[in-house]
């Protein structure tokens, strides 16, 4: 089951909640995932993102708690905070619980340790609205299980001497992260979010980084195929086409 | 400007938030309003609503705080808690602040006094997602100001010896409250929520009460006109048709 969820709020407990980003998290049928978190008002910000991360299914551990709740332990392969070595941000596994409310929204709670595992625990809450990934607008799903089972579920990956990256396609929504290896500054980070419109053209919504043109120009591909963009070869590691 | 907002969460501070209802609040151009709050899982509930209330624009006082925030003081004409005399619920004016977040969601904070004005203050938070009232699905608006200026904005009212009621139409969404005067039990309460579909037929979504058939069967009417449903005469007190 693919999933596209739009964040409704972020809360560092016990501070009041807020939402300053347009955050979308995409997950494929096989559990590959990316979350891209651009600020709505990015004026004056050199890096116009709160955060971005992603990984393949081997970077996430899911356990069912009950019909309504799962525990998810994330150990991101890609993490802009780690890449940039942002001080006072978490390293390593993040333990979370995802709980579905009657209304269909999904509450995520967990803890991070910005000052190391021996440091102060910071509890957080995020709230997620499942949206229909096959639509270009944000059309709410009553429950994330109501998602179209036939929606595109595609993942592309690159890992060569110079670059490592991941692109996730769910329905009409594409999100991507591309890191230049060994470059731990903004020059090493590329992010994008696009939509596949009714004519199957890719329309860019968010694009960041010197190498952003290396994100794949075509994504509706079969598993095992290769697509090259500005010299960078991407492998399709999952596709339901 | 009409408004249709879907509640995302309800929080009695400092308890954790939750959302067990599908709550919609509708407000017309002139400021007449209704909020209907049915539980998603109403099994076993004699009254399957958390609450419902409404009023005309003279039952609300709005003051601008800044570009992002307004204070709103509600003094409902219709309030199911008051009608049923539910113990430990608020009476009289409720003072609230509505603040628009960067993401377009609207945070409402305020206090109620369930044990009277001298009793304990209970702080609450609600969070609202503006949705497009001209659509049958829940299509999110980036900002409530993005609403279609031509959307239907209609209010119907009844106040005779036996009944008092209000119906609010914004876009394709209709919500209504009808009280039987002097009957302070569930027998005196009627609530409904409907949609006007593409064929201009009214499709019922929520319908409660012995007199629910008295809600108007036609609502796309001019200001000043009268429509009668099962003997009950409704006056159109606002219409932009």
Swiss-Prot record, chains A, B:
Its main location: cytoplasm. Keywords: Cytoplasm, Nucleus. Disulfide bonds: none annotated. GO terms for cellular component: cytoplasm; nucleus. The keyword Cytoplasm applies. Signal peptide: none annotated. This is Protein HRI1. It comes from Kluyveromyces lactis (strain ATCC 8585 / CBS 2359 / DSM 70799 / NBRC 1267 / NRRL Y-1140 / WM37) (Yeast).
């Amino acid at each position: 089951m693919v999933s596209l969820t739009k964040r409704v709020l972020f809360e560092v407990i016990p501070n009041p909640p807020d939402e300053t980003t347009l955050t979308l998290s995409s997950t494929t049928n096989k559990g590959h995932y990316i979350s891209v978190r651009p600020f709505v008002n990015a004026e004056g910000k050199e890096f116009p993102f709160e955060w971005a991360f992603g990984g393949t299914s081997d970077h996430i551990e899911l356990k069912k708690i009950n019909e309504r709740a799962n525990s998810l332990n994330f150990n991101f392969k890609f993490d802009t905070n780690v890449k940039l070595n942002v001080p006072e941000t978490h390293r390593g596994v993040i333990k979370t619980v995802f709980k579905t409310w009657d209304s269909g929204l999904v509450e995520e709670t967990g803890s991070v340790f910005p000052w190391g595992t021996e440091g102060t625990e910071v509890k957080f809450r995020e709230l997620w609205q499942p949206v229909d990934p096959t639509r270009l607008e944000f059309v709410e799903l009553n429950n994330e299980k109501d998602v179209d089972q036939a929606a595109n579920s595609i993942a592309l990956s690159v890992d060569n001497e110079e670059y490592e990256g991941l692109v996730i396609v769910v329905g009409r929504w594409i999100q991507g992260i591309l890191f230049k290896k060994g470059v731990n500054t903004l020059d090493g980070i590329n992010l994008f979010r696009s939509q596949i419109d009714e004519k199957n053209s890719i329309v860019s919504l968010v694009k960041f980084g010197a190498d952003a043109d290396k994100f794949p120009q075509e994504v509706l591909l079969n598993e095992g195929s290769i697509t090259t963009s500005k010299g960078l070869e991407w492998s399709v590691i999952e596709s339901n086409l």
